[in-house]
Amino acid sequence: MSWIILVIAGLLEVVWAVGLKYTHGFSRLTPSVITVTAMIVSLALLAWAMKSLPVGTAYAVWTGIGAVGAAITGIVLLGESANPMRLASLALIVLGIIGLKLSTH
């Protein structure tokens, strides 16, 4: 169950990371409320997952999901570049996340 909670926390990290772009420095109310809410819930779920997962593993997986998710969102929705080096780097992060999951008992 902790892994599911951690994945949800990571997905919410994507929401708030991308949401920051739309807040315009927290000057727009609706995107700001959504972003801050996603931040709070994401951190709360991360803390909950860390009760039974190793801190280093949980934090690395959380940030990895957020980084990969934000980068993919940027590529797909925001027209950011998807050059081979960037895609290979994202693949390495995903492999690291898988490795951390497989090495945690």
Swiss-Prot record:
This is Guanidinium exporter. It is a multi-pass membrane protein. Residues 50-57, 103-105 are periplasmic. The keyword Nucleotidyltransferase does not apply. InterPro entries: Small_drug/metabolite_transptr (IPR000390), Small_multidrug_res (IPR045324). Coiled coil: none annotated. Gene3D superfamilies: 1.10.3730.20.
